[in-house]
From Swiss-Prot:
Family: Belongs to the Syd family.
Any one annotated GO CC term: cytoplasmic side of plasma membrane
Keyword hit for Membrane: yes
Key words, A-Z: Cell inner membrane, Cell membrane, Membrane
Residues forming coiled coils: none
Role of this protein: Interacts with the SecY protein in vivo. May bind preferentially to an uncomplexed state of SecY, thus functioning either as a chelating agent for excess SecY in the cell or as a regulatory factor that negatively controls the translocase function.
Gene from which the chain derives: syd
Membrane topology: Peripheral membrane protein
Pfam family name, one: Syd
Protein name: Protein Syd
Length: 215
């Protein structure tokens, strides 16, 4: 099974878990932002959490611009994980605790993600640490779930530090160990100066970056 197949399967299991437990689709706060994955009866402009479901992209999105900017070859799993689907944030339970996976809400969201990953890669280069890119958060102390770009292994990582605990040999293997967490949607408060808030977890990633850089 590929990373994309494992992610698609988790989306399907995630949706089924909400339908079985709550009788409805997963919901998230949209911050007024439209998305192809919003359900037909959703109201993008509402302040209330709205129902969503995974939708395949018509064209695959890639990270060639980030690779070019950093002059590195990014591990192919990054395109599989981020480039094929639109979806809301995925809350999970795992052998290592609760967490949340980043997913792409709309096209603008993908651009924001590229900027965040580029900033993360630049930080790793500046600190002379192994290159990683993130796919989510885990635990209650804002640790990242990151992928080692050299070999595709999955790790826990604190911003500004080297990864400290390997979670899986691959992103595919990591995804296969997750279980959907059926829980109320989380409202992620963005700093006041931020434009285009993300319905998922970029607020937490931004906070980690600000704590590291003092900005």
């Amino acid at each position: 099974m590929s990373c994309l197949a494992a992610l698609t399967k988790f989306h399907e299991i995630y949706k089924a878990a909400f339908v079985e437990r709550l009788g409805e689709l997963p919901r998230c706060f949209t911050h007024g932002r439209p998305s192809p994955c919003l359900a037909d009866d959703a109201l993008a402009g509402s302040e209330e959490p709205q129902p969503w479901q995974m939708v395949p992209r018509r064209e695959v999105a890639v990270f060639n611009n980030v690779s070019h900017a950093m002059d590195i070859e990014l591990h192919h799993d990054i395109d599989d994980f981020y480039g094929h689907l639109f979806g809301g944030p995925l809350q999970f339970d795992s052998p290592w605790g609760e967490g949340e996976l980043i997913q792409i809400w709309n096209e603008d969201d993908f651009v924001l993600l590229q900027q965040n990953i580029l900033g993360h890669l630049m930080m790793k280069k500046q600190l002379k640490q192994p290159q990683t890119w993130f796919v989510g958060l885990i635990g209650d102390v804002d640790e990242m779930v990151s992928v080692n770009n050299a070999d595709g292994t999955v790790w826990r990582e604190v911003a500004g530090q080297e990864p400290h605990e390997q979670l899986a040999e691959s992103l595919e293997a990591f995804l296969q160990q997750l279980k959907p967490r059926v829980a109320p949607p989380q409202y992620h408060q963005e700093p006041a100066a931020t434009v285009n808030p993300h319905p998922g977890i970029f607020a937490s990633l931004k906070r980690m970056w600000q704590n590291l850089t003092g900005r």
